[in-house]
Curated annotation (Swiss-Prot):
Produced by kidney or liver of adult mammals and by liver of fetal or neonatal mammals. GO terms for biological process: cell surface receptor signaling pathway via STAT; cellular hyperosmotic response; embryo implantation; erythrocyte differentiation; erythrocyte maturation; erythropoietin-mediated signaling pathway; hemoglobin biosynthetic process; myeloid cell apoptotic process. Disulfide bonds join C32-C187, C54-C58. It comes from the Eukaryota. Residues 1-25 form the signal peptide. GO terms for cellular component: cell surface; extracellular space. Pfam families: EPO_TPO. Glycans are attached at N49, N63, N108. The keyword Glycoprotein applies. It is found in: Secreted. Belongs to the EPO/TPO family. Its main location: secreted. This is Erythropoietin.
């Protein structure tokens, strides 16, 4: 009864054991699945659309610095991978700071709208997840490996916004632009 009962269980465990191996490399490949990035882009667009017509409660009492999301495709394609990684990593860091600052300003507002707070909280969560996924893809290491003395490593271009709708537009544009370009190239390289 004892040995016979263990045999099917042992066989089942041998069958299921290899299924655990793909999970070890899942985070790096996860960002390479276009549906994952599309989900974050969709959330950013929803937040942008929700705040477009918003006047009351959507303006900040101070300016928030955000990354410039414009992409010169010719220059981008000629950039070294490390430069692209640095631009994306710095942009993501600045955008995270901006969203967190927006969250703090919204929390201190006299009558914060719960729907706006929900969109900001989702953006904070999304940026944390994207940061983790980019770290698994190696973006942080590539950005750090770029020598500071490289003349083509220009400082990140930035400007300020004064409203939640503008902040979400930048968030959406950054995800659709530089982040999508970088992850697409990093995933195509196939060494991840």
């Amino acid at each position: 009864m004892g040995a016979r009962d263990c045999t099917p269980l042992l066989m089942l465990s041998f069958l299921l054991f290899p299924l655990g191996f793909p999970v070890l490399g899942a985070p790096a490949r996860l960002i390479c699945d276009s549906r994952v990035l599309e989900r974050y882009i969709l959330e950013a667009r929803e937040a942008e659309n929700a705040t477009m017509g918003c006047a009351e409660g959507c303006s900040f009492n101070e300016n928030i610095t955000v990354p410039d999301t414009k992409v010169n495709f010719y220059a981008w394609k000629r950039m070294e991978v490390q430069q692209q990684a640095q631009e994306v990593w710095q942009g993501l860091a600045l955008l995270s700071e901006a969203i967190l600052r927006g969250q703090a300003l919204l929390a201190n507002a006299s009558q914060p709208c719960e729907a706006l707070r929900l969109h900001v909280d989702k953006a904070v969560s999304g940026l944390r997840s994207l940061t983790s996924l980019l770290r698994a893809l190696g973006a942080q290491k590539e950005a750090i490996s770029l020598p500071d003395a490289t003349p083509s490593a220009a400082p990140l271009r930035a400007f300020t916004v004064d409203a939640l709708s503008k902040l979400f537009r930048i968030y959406s544009n950054f995800l659709r632009g530089k982040l999508t370009l970088y992850t697409g190239e990093a995933c195509r390289r196939g060494d991840r």
